[in-house]
């Protein structure tokens, strides 16, 4: 009877614990953090903290001893574990490279059938090589990521990721490749370099770590770990100025072409405007253009004479520049309306000529109708061909005399004298 009573009491206690656990299930989160990735043989610290889902409106359990954290971390080797204030921390070491899942959940103490209050997982990468990264700094602040200024010193450093101080007794060597053909071997993780030309460069560093380790047979041996790291650098030139090539005197309705040369690295955000005076541009007066080269051509036609000023503003990721260009526009002696006068004159002349030719053709036809052709033929025949149709030369001469009354006689008359 006593045993039956004990069993009932035990199950009743479990149900009391199970009730709150079921009610609380789904109301909490487990925040899981780790200082990985890590190198094979180094120690990794993983922490799990119980948190409320609704940002603190629900209180955490008052008695932290009523709950337990359960971990699954195989095949990683557990080196230490501790729990405090609903936070559990473990230390593990990986013997082989790979990505290993870590799982943790929280349940009520002494109740394995209770539903977990919260659970969480993460993937821990273990690498054969060293773990770290390259840090590049310069005494400038640019808005473009990984962008730096040419002809200024760059500080490049390698930061080893070793939170457990596993490599504190190791010796390191660094082989730097700056991407422009320059190589440097040093035992210092920090170097300084100056790029003289703009462009995109990939800086690489090979890190070698060596240390002595006692083998199982009590002999010392040298252990070596290596790692290859790289970083992309975008070197840009500051915008030092704008060169404007173009005329300063112009006539109206004449096409103006200006060439702008930018002394700086593209891309460039260019803004230009036209004013009577050389004053800074407002945003509403700006004609924005994105220039991807170091030159830009601008064309414009002035319709009114006067004094004008072109205002140019350009900026890249490093700096800004302004430039002005004054120009005088004179009235043109060859205005566009002058084209209409010669065209109208030419058309008028053509019309007059056509009318003249038409009238002349009509008059000629009228003369031909009024003058019979037989008269002319008769005259021609009488004058030119008379000798062929007349019977004697005397008749021919008579006809000629009739037609040409002023012709002298062909023979003198014989004078007779009487004595």
Curated annotation (Swiss-Prot):
Membrane-side (Cytoplasmic) residue stretches: 358-419
Keyword Membrane in annotation: yes
UniProt entry keywords in alphabetical sequence: Glycoprotein, Golgi apparatus, Membrane, Signal, Transmembrane, Transmembrane helix
Membrane topology: Single-pass type I membrane protein
Compartment list: Golgi apparatus membrane
Transmembrane region(s): 337-357
Gene3D superfamilies, A to Z: Immunoglobulins
Domain PKD: 144-230
InterPro entries for this protein: Ig-like_fold (IPR013783), PKAT (IPR045219), PKAT_KLD (IPR046846), PKD_dom (IPR000601), PKD_dom_sf (IPR035986)
PANTHER family reported for this sequence: MELANOCYTE PROTEIN PMEL 17-RELATED, TRANSMEMBRANE PROTEIN 130
Name of protein: Transmembrane protein 130
Organism whose genome encodes this protein: Mus musculus
């Amino acid at each position: 009877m006593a045993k039956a009573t004990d069993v009932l009491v035990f199950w009743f206690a479990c149900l009391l614990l199970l009730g709150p656990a079921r009610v609380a299930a789904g109301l909490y989160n487990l925040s899981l953090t780790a200082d990985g990735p890590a190198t094979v043989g180094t120690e990794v610290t993983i922490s799990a903290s119980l948190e409320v889902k609704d940002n603190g409106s629900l209180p955490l359990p008052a008695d932290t001893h009523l709950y337990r954290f359960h971990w699954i971390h195989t095949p990683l080797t557990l080196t230490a574990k501790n729990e405090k204030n609903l936070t559990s921390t473990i230390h593990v070491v990986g013997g082989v490279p790979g990505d290993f899942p870590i799982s943790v959940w929280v349940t009520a103490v002494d109740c394995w059938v209770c539903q977990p209050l919260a659970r969480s997982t993460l993937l821990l990468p273990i690498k054969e090589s060293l773990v770290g990264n390259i840090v590049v700094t310069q005494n400038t602040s640019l808005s473009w990521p990984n962008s730096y200024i040419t002809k200024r010193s760059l500080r490049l450093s390698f930061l080893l990721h070793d939170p457990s101080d596993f490599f504190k007794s190791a010796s390191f060597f660094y082989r730097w490749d700056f991407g422009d053909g320059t190589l440097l071997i040093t035992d210092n993780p920090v170097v300084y370099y100056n790029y003289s030309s703009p462009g995109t460069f990939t800086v690489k560093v090979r890190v070698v770590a060596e240390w002595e380790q006692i083998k199982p047979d009590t002999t010392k041996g040298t252990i070596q770990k290596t790692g290859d790291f790289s970083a992309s650098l975008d070197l840009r030139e500051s915008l030092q100025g704008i060169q404007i090539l173009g005329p300063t005197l112009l006539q109206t309705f004449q096409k103006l072409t200006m060439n702008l040369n930018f002394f700086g690295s593209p891309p460039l955000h260019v803004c230009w405007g036209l004013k009577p005076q050389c004053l800074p541009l407002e945003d509403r007066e700006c004609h924005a253009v994105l220039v991807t080269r170091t030159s830009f051509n601008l064309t414009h036609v002035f319709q009114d004479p006067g004094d004008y000023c072109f205002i140019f503003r350009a900026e890249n990721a490093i700096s800004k520049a302004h430039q002005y260009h004054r120009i005088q526009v004179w009235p043109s002696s060859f205005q566009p309306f002058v084209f209409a006068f010669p065209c109208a004159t030419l058309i008028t002349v053509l019309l007059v000529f056509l009318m003249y030719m038409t009238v002349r053709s009509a008059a000629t036809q009228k003369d031909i109708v009024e003058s019979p052709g037989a008269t002319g033929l008769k005259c021609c025949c009488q004058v030119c061909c008379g000798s062929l149709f007349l019977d004697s030369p005397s008749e021919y001469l008579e006809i000629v005399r009739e037609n040409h009354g002023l012709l002298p006689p062909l023979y003198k008359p014989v004078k007779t004298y009487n004595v």
